[in-house]
Amino acid sequence: MWLKIQVFVLALALITLGIQAEPNSGPNNPLIQEEARACADVYKECWYPEKPCCKDRACQCTLGMTCKCKATLGDLFGRR
């Protein structure tokens, strides 16, 4: 009887883990797509040369080495 309860609890735990792991496991996951981009958008983290800023924007770094893509005047006024 005790063995049946242990097997049931183990099976229930494995099923629960499997259900929790499924939503983010697909190739169309937004987090995976964001990391796979070749360049960084405005105000996103950048690091040259691995992930430069898109559209020749400047990658501006602080003293703490946190680098973000700087907006251009066209970005500020809605031009693309």
From Swiss-Prot:
GO terms for molecular function: calcium channel regulator activity; ion channel inhibitor activity; toxin activity. Keywords: Calcium channel impairing toxin, Disulfide bond, Ion channel impairing toxin, Knottin, Neurotoxin, Secreted, Signal, Toxin, Voltage-gated calcium channel impairing toxin. It comes from the Eukaryota. Residues 1-21 form the signal peptide. Residues 22-37, 72-80 form a propeptide. GO terms for cellular component: extracellular region. Disulfide bonds join 39-54, 46-59, 53-69, 61-67. Expressed by the venom gland. Its main location: secreted. It holds the Pfam family Toxin_9. InterPro entries: Spidertoxin. The keyword Repeat does not apply. Antagonist of L-type calcium channels (Cav1/CACNA1). The presence of a 'disulfide through disulfide knot' structurally defines this protein as a knottin. Belongs to the neurotoxin 02 (plectoxin) family. 01 (Tx3) subfamily. This is U6-ctenitoxin-Pn1a. It comes from Phoneutria nigriventer.
